[in-house]
Amino acid sequence: MTTLKLDTLSDRIKAHKNALVHIVKPPVCTERAQHYTEMYQQHLDKPIPVRRALALAHHLANRTIWIKHDELIIGNQASEVRAAPIFPEYTVSWIEKEIDDLADRPGAGFAVSEENKRVLHEVCPWWRGQTVQDRCYGMFTDEQKGLLATGIIKAEGNMTSGDAHLAVNFPLLLEKGLDGLREEVAERRSRINLTVLEDLHGEQFLKAIDIVLVAVSEHIERFAALAREMAATETRESRRDELLAMAENCDLIAHQPPQTFWQALQLCYFIQLILQIESNGHSVSFGRMDQYLYPYYRRDVELNQTLDREHAIEMLHSCWLKLLEVNKIRSGSHSKASAGSPLYQNVTIGGQNLVDGQPMDAVNPLSYAILESCGRLRSTQPNLSVRYHAGMSNDFLDACVQVIRCGFGMPAFNNDEIVIPEFIKLGIEPQDAYDYAAIGCIETAVGGKWGYRCTGMSFINFARVMLAALEGGHDATSGKVFLPQEKALSAGNFNNFDEVMDAWDTQIRYYTRKSIEIEYVVDTMLEENVHDILCSALVDDCIERAKSIKQGGAKYDWVSGLQVGIANLGNSLAAVKKLVFEQGAIGQQQLAAALADDFDGLTHEQLRQRLINGAPKYGNDDDTVDTLLARAYQTYIDELKQYHNPRYGRGPVGGNYYAGTSSISANVPFGAQTMATPDGRKAHTPLAEGASPASGTDHLGPTAVIGSVGKLPTAAILGGVLLNQKLNPATLENESDKQKLMILLRTFFEVHKGWHIQYNIVSRETLLDAKKHPDQYRDLVVRVAGYSAFFTALSPDAQDDIIARTEHML
């Protein structure tokens, strides 16, 4: 078996990482807000695609750039290290309200200088009434506004933070280079017919792409000039040589395809960076990096031996730390659902390739190098995912487990055995299906061929919908009734449990439809107002169709719906079925009163204990609750299938919705807005995250958990089925324990057809001490949901949620 070298970092990488993890309150950068406002004001007469292209070009030409001491990969998102830019075209309302209090946020604070406050107070008023969020609310119906106000459906993220959730076509970029892409655009423009309406709009889009590609080239040339300027005054010969080499790299990749591993990695990082300057969206991912960078790695490291493996890993480390520098500021409410300020920049390794019609294991030496580099660095970025398949070698799986034992929540695993065949059933070409990658958290898409947002824009609070179904449509939190029904526990008029399920079906269909209506509005406003030009240029077939991603330019386009509180739904329904209708141990009105009182008083607390201990719980491989949950979830899936997204019929294959369970950390704020539930959960406490069991309810070990998760209708949940498991570090101390985990992984993916799994390897005692002494644990990384975060950067509520999760032994 290959033994990875997981305890080695170069001095420069150690210093760089240490400096980054000790930035507790990152600054805010206002340069982008200033530059975009200037160009929007100057070019109001221009079509929006051209206006946005000019704004990006102006910003890239005039923003502050820097090269840090000893870094090997260069490029910065903002004027200061880890500073978060402001994107006023999406929203200014929360910025104006919260700007003075950003430093006081628990776990996600930002430092704002008085000068930056002055700039924002100057810039923001111009945007009032014309941001994406403003225009969404101008289109929402009163009913939709009411639903959003209650929080049963939440869709703030994309109105205020943009789109994304995709990987662009990095292989095409490396093959053609930036000048080659410009040639492709020029050829397409030569076929434009300006007497055709679609082409008239297409010409403006293609013109915008050309403006942006020129701007990107010139921006890279700025770094070449800066590197030469720094080399001229550098006293250390070795660093001077590095700076000159970086200048030469930038000179080449500013126009031509890269020739070396260093150049290829640098070009990919520049594009990754500028994509996140262009758009405020997150989960901008790299796709299958071990595949498209391997030819360069093989030539330099294995064949020509012009680069040794250790130096290649150091370059990867430098790239990963540059990803950690990228930052994002969200509204106070949205930051609670994205605890730890994650960017979800996913790198996928492993899996299979389709070669002459036959699946072949895709693991190569770069797969091992990327895995090892992440295991050594133990950072939150990139979000490393491994594509599992039945033919994966024990050697590579063993290497993955070695990294899992490092305790930073990576790698996560996605399962080829279910993703690929289900993608092919959707209509995705087999060659493309075998080329899928993890996007953001657990979502999957085909890099460079899939439209924005493989994850949806609106979360549905399943627990609150369930409570409404039990109480005649009445939302216990807001007091509102959106869809009235006759039956209610408080009236004691449910005749049997089938009527409870009928009520659930009715309510979830209603809320699902409303979530899609809201998605439509947000999608439409993003399409009309924030064309992301560079991103579209790097997704097939946007150039050929002369359409942005949002207009239907991508080859494929599916969007997943999202929900929070899946396990709470199953556990609550199981408790009502068994204790109220089968045993008659609890009366309908008795349960309703206990829920309304949040189980206050001795009698209600005794009833709560019966709900907790006397009814089956999801996560223990118990069919009575697992199949009930699957049945309830299926109604949501069936309703979702009825709808098309706004790109349907406009070019892409697909244009539909499917389910997904990536709840990020929304289970904490959603729980805070949810009253007591029949599973015994108290009001305002966290809901279950993803498709994982509710904290403290999975008593029979990790094998029972995967048995329960495997009964979900996974094949229809193509947005991903998120499973977090927390293991005590003592569990993986010896070789036999490692073998047990490998067997567990193979069983989950091959027998139970699981979609995804990831592990926290950290003790409760360590987490409690880190909460008490944060300065001693600034580099402690934990798995939150489909992403990892620095534990001390989380809010106290999010920290408590992770501490409360069940800790398993193998």
From Swiss-Prot:
Domain PFL stretches: 11-682
Gene that encodes the chain: ybiW
CDD domains noted in UniProt: PFL2_DhaB_BssA (cd01677)
Note: Contains a dehydratase motif that is predictive of enzyme function.
Record-given protein name: Probable dehydratase YbiW
Residue list for modification Glycine radical: G786
Region feature (Disordered): 677-699
Glycine radical domain mapped to chain residues: 689-810
One Gene Ontology term of the molecular function aspect: lyase activity
Keyword tags: Lyase, Organic radical
Family in the record: Belongs to the glycyl radical enzyme (GRE) family.
EC id: 4.2.1.-
Stated role: Probably shows dehydratase activity.
Pfam families, per database record: Gly_radical, PFL-like
PANTHER family given in the database record: DEHYDRATASE YBIW-RELATED (PTHR43641:SF2), FORMATE ACETYLTRANSFERASE 3-RELATED (PTHR43641)
One GO CC annotation: cytosol
